[in-house]
Amino acid sequence: MTKALYLDCHAGIAGDMLLSALVDLGAHPEDIESELKKLPLDQFKLHFQKRVKQGIHAMTLNIDVKESNHHRHVNDIFKMIDDSTLPERVKYRSKKIFEIIGQAEAKIHGMSFEEVHFHEVGAMDSIIDIIGGCIALEQLGINTLYCSAIPTGHGKIHIAHGIYPIPAPATAEILKGIPIAHFDVQSELTTPTGAAFAKGLVSSFGPFPSATIQHIGYGAGSKDFNFPNILRVIQFDSEFEQQDSVQVIECQIDDMTPEALGDFMNNALEQGALDAYYTPIFMKKSRPSTQLTLICKLHDKIYFEQLILQETSSLGVRSTSVNRKILNRAFKILSTQHGTVSIKFGLQNGKIMKMKPEYEDLKKMAKTTNQPFQVIHNEVLQQLYQTYRIGDILQ
């Protein structure tokens, strides 16, 4: 059994809404503030209070801060987190969210990741939202997060670089591959920080899974509308495998180069395909050929069928809806002599069925220590199997 959290983003998601909802769920604001004040930040005070939003009693957050208004680089924020005494999983989750926002800003502004100035993100309130939210998740013992489709709103927004359409450029970049919900509201409903929380920490998107609800928290946004501007978070104990349906799209291709096939696969995965792979086959006239198989969410069926017809030489596709069963997933941080690595667990009835270190973490660790990847991989696996055992209940 593992603690899981569902983010019901019917009115969007922002960092302050999530932190407020987690406090309403049961996280202790005094402990969150105490942990945050261990960081080298300007003086601040958190004020959580209840407000009524269109009949819904929800928690809100106001931050009193004396800010020096200096911009922070991503490495400044990473160093601040690394040098802190925060729990390892809080460090990992926080850095992952900042990295997602930084990568989006770097791409939009045409600069390297290290050159990114964190304007809004570097501001005190955003640092508090991100790190405070990860502290609250740790307090509540949340291992796995799920999320609904996310509405963005529409219209125009004033940001540091001028007037931009909604979703803001960084938000749109972050939300690539994430299902978007239509909500006809002329306002920004989802911020880059909220989008990065979902992108970085959520295991899967869709309707609420079959489960027994344990607790519910409500976090209110700062704007008032004719609907409840709230984020609802639902805590439940995840005991059984997930079951859902996905779309399998296939076609045969015998006249594309390997380079073109590779480019299409990369593009499809970037656009949100769950998986894509090629199988060598023989077609009529004994021609060596390739079968493309693409797996996506049901609601993405039309989009990926069109993508295949536009970007491959195929004249048609076959599409089938299939059921799938998935082990519950949970993540924990493993501390090693070379640094920390995220471990992905596959669980059934709370028992460990599968476990593996995240490849990207191992790759970074090998690069940082200047050691062969296989050496790092073997050392981490050895420590992993000394710490956890297949069949044990994940604590």
From Swiss-Prot:
Function summary: Involved in the biosynthesis of a nickel-pincer cofactor ((SCS)Ni(II) pincer complex). Binds Ni(2+), and functions in nickel delivery to pyridinium-3,5-bisthiocarboxylic acid mononucleotide (P2TMN), to form the mature cofactor. Is thus probably required for the activation of nickel-pincer cofactor-dependent enzymes.
Q: Which InterPro entries match?
A: Ni_insertion
| Pfam families linked to this entry | Ni_insertion
* A Gene Ontology molecular function term of the record: lyase activity
Would I find Lyase among this entry's keywords?
yes
> Is Lyase found in the keyword set?
yes
Q: Which reaction does it catalyse?
A: Ni(II)-pyridinium-3,5-bisthiocarboxylate mononucleotide = pyridinium-3,5-bisthiocarboxylate mononucleotide + Ni(2+)
Record the organism: Staphylococcus epidermidis (strain ATCC 35984 / DSM 28319 / BCRC 17069 / CCUG 31568 / BM 3577 / RP62A)
Keywords from the UniProt entry: Lyase, Nickel
What is the name of this protein? Pyridinium-3,5-bisthiocarboxylic acid mononucleotide nickel insertion protein
The family annotation for this protein states: Belongs to the LarC family.
Q: Which Gene3D superfamilies match?
A: mk0293 like domain, Transcriptional regulatory protein pf0864 domain like
Its Enzyme Commission number? 4.99.1.12
Q: Which NCBIfam families does this UniProt record tie to the protein?
A: nickel pincer cofactor biosynthesis protein LarC
Example of a GO biological process term:
protein maturation
